[in-house]
From Swiss-Prot:
It is a multi-pass membrane protein. The keyword Transcription does not apply. This is Melanopsin. Belongs to the G-protein coupled receptor 1 family. Opsin subfamily. Disulfide bonds join C143-C221. SUPFAM superfamilies: Family A G protein-coupled receptor-like (SSF81321). Residues 448-465 have a biased composition (Basic and acidic residues). It comes from Homo sapiens. GO terms for molecular function: 11-cis retinal binding; G protein-coupled photoreceptor activity. Expressed in the retina.
Length: 478
């Protein structure tokens, strides 16, 4: 099935290829596009209605580029696909097996890994195979399905990242408004909305609004952003706005206020620690630093995803502006490969920077734990991993705000169901002070102790997690 050597030109009505019964080239490949083999420009391909592809199979057109260009792109996409499939499958397995990682907030990360895995699984093998033969091999239906999967899973990943940013924004900057909500149920509804939103933007090309067509080196498919028709241009602009730019603005807005809230809470804890003069504030600051690190990790994930899709969006906008004739096959294919490479960023980032993920890998996949350099003592399961939130919500009984939070949480369910982090609990504490009209900065030790209820006898010097003779992770109350 290899194409003949020498210059490749699209089949003409007067020259019948040996592999076809009736030489009827697709309607989107007309004589006006015959210069593609000499100029290396993209054809204007727009099968916007059923039946525009030939009824009998015909060889799709090729572009006049060196063979090694196809092989290079094919090799890159194969490596990207294998890395994306194995890496994201590892993330899914680890997060599902590790109890400490099965929190409502991490449901979004699992969904992101599922979306990235499906992106790699549906895109890389097809792209690689077509690159070996230097032309699209799977016909109209295969092209449409391939492009639909790329759009669906790419949009799902972008909107999932937006949902992560919004979720962190709400629980950190609006803790009282979200306190007590069934987080797992809420996360499930949000993820359902994410997939419905992605589906709503992926289906229109099947109904005549734009189309799914070959692109670049004509070994992969995407939505038609090259045609300069009102319908195609409208779809391209709306897709870029509501799938790329609007989510990007929401993410930027959320993380600006997230880091501002972290900074303000850190100052509040520092002031409180100066008033109390003990080790509690130091422990709280360490937890705050941990939350800040996790926020930075997610911000890095989002930035890499945006940078991966930015070149592809730029190419689409160039064509939208009417300059499709300046786009070469390379200028379309290379950004497409970069966009698909966004599926490999998350597993690599987690493996390098996410401490609990590294430990969970060492526990459930010891061979990978050795590769990541996780020590043997860190790979042993700890009792404290059964809930990542208990130590914070039970370690501050000397303060009435912490006791109120704990009592209310017990009435609502376990920490694993509520899904609060150290940062969120600290934010509730500060927000509760502000809601009562009191400034956290102006409260001294006397004010805080006056509010605290009497402690049980025999526990004046004890706090949960600091029971005599026990380290925090061994406290039976945790």
């Amino acid at each position: 099935m290899n194409p003949p050597s020498g210059p490749r030109v699209p089949p003409s009505p007067t020259q019948e290829p040996s592999c076809m019964a009736t030489p009827a080239p697709p309607s989107w490949w007309d004589s006006s596009q015959s210069s593609i083999s000499s100029l290396g420009r993209l054809p204007s391909i727009s099968p916007t209605a059923p039946g525009t592809w030939a009824a009998a199979w015909v060889p799709l057109p090729t572009v006049d580029v060196p063979d090694h260009a196809h092989y290079t792109l094919g090799t890159v996409i194969l490596l990207v696909g294998l890395t994306g499939m194995l890496g994201n499958l590892t993330v899914i397995y680890t997060f599902c097996r590790s109890r400490s990682l099965r929190t409502p907030a991490n449901m979004f990360i699992i969904n992101l890994a599922v979306s990235d895995f499906l992106m790699s699984f549906t895109q890389a093998p097809v792209f690689f195979t077509s690159s070996l033969y230097k032309q699209w091999l799977f016909g109209e239906t295969g092209c449409e399905f391939y492009a639909f999967c790329g759009a669906l899973f790419g949009i799902s990943s972008m909107i999932t990242l937006t949902a992560i940013a919004l979720d962190r924004y709400l629980v950190i900057t609006r803790p009282l408004a979200t306190f007590g909500v069934a987080s797992k149920r809420r996360a499930a509804f949000v993820l359902l909305g994410v997939w419905l939103y992605a589906l709503a933007w992926s289906l229109p090309p099947f109904f005549g609004w734009s189309a799914y067509v070959p692109e670049g080196l004509l070994t992969s498919c995407s939505w038609d952003y090259m045609s300069f028709t009102p319908a195609v241009r409208a779809y391209t602009m709306l897709l870029c706005c509501f799938v790329f730019f609007l989510p990007l603005l929401i993410i930027i807005y959320c993380y600006i206020f997230i880091f501002r809230a972290i900074r303000e809470t850190g100052r509040a804890l520092q002031t409180f620690g100066a008033c109390k003069g003990n080790g509690e504030s130091l422990w709280q600051r360490q937890r705050l630093q941990s939350e800040c690190k996790m926020a930075k990790i997610m911000l890095l994930v989002i930035l890499l995803f945006v940078l991966s899709w930015a070149p592809y969006s730029a190419v689409a906008l160039v064509a939208f502006a009417g300059y499709a004739h300046v786009l070469t096959p390379y200028m379309s294919s290379v950004p497409a490969v970069i966009a698909k490479a966004s599926a490999i960023h998350n597993p690599i980032i987690y493996a390098i920077t996410h401490p609990k993920y590294r430990v969970a890998i060492a526990q459930h996949l010891p061979c990978l734990g050795v590769l990541l350099g996780v020590s043997r003592r860190h790979s042993r399961p700890y009792p404290s991993y059964r809930s990542t939130h208990r130590s914070t919500l039970t370690s501050h009984t000397s303060n009435l705000s912490w006791i109120s939070i704990r009592r209310r949480q017990e009435s609502l369910g376990s920490e694993s169901e509520v899904g609060w982090t150290h940062m969120e609990a600290a934010a509730v504490w500060g927000a509760a002070q502000q809601a009562n009209g009191r400034s956290l900065y102006g409260q001294g030790l006397e004010d805080l102790e006056a509010k605290a209820p009497p402690r049980p006898q025999g526990h004046e010097a004890e706090t949960p997690g600091k029971t005599k003779g026990l380290i925090p992770s061994q406290d039976p109350r945790m």
